């Protein structure tokens, strides 16, 4: 029996997992690292801390697993996307990484849009332009840290830096390259037009390969330090969004999944990028060669739920204690009936991406009366998040048909949300056994395919559905009326959101 090691190099830390080739989870370990905020809109992490966490979690799962280490065939990483990691020709790190959440490069966004129209950028990259994309951060570094820019041999992504430490190779994959604002999503090559417009040298960008590319064996001295066999192959891997698609079992055209965590998104699998005329959705490059995953993403899904729990019940972010609060709130929701006077919640606590892409939008409760209770507001929050997801689904369905949807992510532990999402979306949903392991499963699948243990159809061994939920027919008509009011309310408040953003209290 062969084994596969996967790492989910996320925003809060690195999670290592060990799977058997038949899909069984053998061991897992997590180690966190610090995030730095050196100025307004600036968010950084130390890649050396990523490496320390990677080494720690690797050591811990090897100690937990009672297996012959020589049977570990491959390793792959799912990495946080849109980071920039500058290294010199020897692979030496030159500064802390500017990570995905950093928005300092707004100036570079304006400069690029002055040269290339937004619609042309969307056609080339498959995405709306954002200061979070790696290419804009590289342009910022060239302007404000020119010495560092000149000394940089390659600008890497998060997972690519760990791969460099393991193998000595400078490389990235299609899924990460697509989210740089420098890559042509149709030809899967660097866009000389966009690179030139930003004034960046293409020689400073790594070669791009399929996610399942074999980078070779771990360097002997590194393998010895980690306790891994030097025969263990390193497979290039993918960004976390792409890995989640694989780990959700979305590996064939038409497969669709919904991730419901702090943020949320709906992705479906296609043979071509989906270029929406209103630019409401974006397209990613899949780990399955030749496929894409058009997606619509919202900012504050589980975040809305955490906010309302903290505000009304004093229970904060979604950690271990949430298992109890989910059950408690589910019980209250089951015991209560929908109030005769409906409340609408617009879930825009952090602005919004899909489908309206409005950073000025804000969270809003409409229709409160003195007879409403706390639990009525909780219900409205769940409904509001679900309705925004329906709006995203409609944006996708204008271009392609969508059937059954698999739902993953920590928030889906709520029984009420499962039923409500199915009913409001009007779709049958399925829930897999390991709702929290999608990115790890995706990285493991990519490793196994890359080393030849199986092909992507083996995902059925890793992703096993344990629940199927149908829409509640008698509730759908009421929800359709509310959904219409939900969209009308947003449009009615657009100007108010914009003007409110200009009001600052001293």
Q: Residue locations for each model-derived region?
A:
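Residue-level signal for inorganic ion chemistry
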Residues: 23, 46, 75, 102, ...
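Short glycine-/acidic-enriched loop or helix-start segments at secondary-structure transitions
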Residues: 16, 84-87, 96, 268-269, ...
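Active-site core segments that coordinate phosphate-bearing ligands/cofactors
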Residues: 5-6, 106, 113-128, 136-171, ...
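N-terminal glycine/serine-rich phosphate-binding loop of ATP-dependent small-molecule kinases
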Residues: 1-95, 123, 151, 223-224, ...
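Short linear loop/turn motifs
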Residues: 206-214, 321-328
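Short beta-strand-loop/turn "lid" adjacent to the catalytic site in phosphate-handling enzymes
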Residues: 63-100, 128-134, 163-184, 207-210, ...
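Structural signal for short hydrophobic segments within the conserved structured cores
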Residues: 27-31, 206, 467
């Amino acid at each position: 029996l062969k084994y596969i090691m996967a790492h989910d190099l996320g925003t809060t830390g690195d999670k290592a997992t060990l799977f058997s080739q038949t899909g069984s989870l053998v061991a897992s370990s997590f180690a966190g690292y610090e995030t730095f905020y050196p100025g307004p809109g600036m968010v950084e992490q130390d890649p050396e801390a990523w490496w320390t966490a990677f080494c720690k979690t690797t050591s811990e799962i090897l100690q937990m697993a009672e297996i012959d280490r020589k049977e570990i065939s491959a390793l792959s990483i799912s990495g946080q996307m849109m980071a920039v990691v500058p290294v010199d020709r020897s692979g030496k790190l030159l500064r802390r990484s500017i990570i995905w959440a950093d928005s300092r490069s707004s100036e570079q966004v304006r400069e690029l849009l002055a040269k290339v129209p937004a619609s042309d950028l969307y056609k080339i990259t498959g995405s709306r332009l954002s200061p979070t994309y790696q290419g804009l951060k590289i342009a910022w570094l060239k302007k404000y840290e020119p010495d560092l820019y000149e000394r940089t041999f390659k600008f890497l992504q998060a997972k690519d830096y760990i791969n460099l430490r393991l193998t000595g190779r400078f490389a990235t994959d299609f899924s990460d390259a697509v989210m740089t604002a420098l890559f042509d999503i149709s030809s899967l090559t660097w866009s000389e037009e966009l690179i030139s417009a930003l004034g960046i040298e293409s020689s400073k960008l790594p070669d791009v390969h399929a996610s399942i590319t074999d980078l070779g064996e771990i360097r002997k001295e590194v393998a010895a330090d980690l306790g891994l066999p030097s025969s263990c192959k390193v497979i290039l891997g993918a960004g976390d969004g792409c890995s989640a698609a694989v780990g959700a079992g979305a590996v064939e055209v038409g497969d669709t999944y919904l991730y419901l965590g702090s943020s949320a998104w709906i992705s479906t699998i296609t043979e071509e990028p989906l270029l929406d005329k209103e630019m409401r959705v974006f397209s990613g490059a899949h780990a399955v060669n030749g496929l894409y995953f058009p997606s619509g993403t919202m900012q504050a899904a589980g975040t809305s739920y955490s906010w309302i729990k903290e505000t009304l019940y004093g229970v904060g972010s979604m950690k271990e204690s949430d298992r109890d609060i989910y059950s408690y709130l589910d019980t209250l929701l089951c015991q209560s009936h929908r109030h005769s006077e409906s409340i609408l919640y617009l879930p825009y606590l952090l602005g919004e991406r899909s489908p309206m892409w409005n950073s000025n939008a804000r969270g809003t409760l409409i229709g409160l009366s003195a007879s409403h209770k706390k639990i009525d507001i909780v219900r409205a929050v769940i409904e509001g998040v679900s309705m925004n997801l329906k709006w995203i689904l409609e944006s996708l369905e204008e271009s392609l048909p969508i059937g059954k949807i698999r739902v993953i992510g920590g928030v889906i532990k709520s029984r009420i949300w499962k039923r409500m999402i199915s009913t409001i979306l009007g779709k049958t949903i399925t829930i897999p056994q390991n709702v929290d392991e999608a990115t790890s499963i995706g990285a493991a699948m990519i490793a196994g395919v890359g080393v030849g243990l199986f092909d992507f159809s083996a995902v059925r061994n890793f992703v096993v559905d344990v629940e199927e939920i149908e829409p509640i027919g008698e509730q759908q008509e009421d929800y359709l009326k509310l959904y219409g009011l939900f969209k009308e309310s947003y449009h009615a408040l657009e100007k108010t959101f914009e003007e409110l953003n200009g009001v600052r209290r001293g």
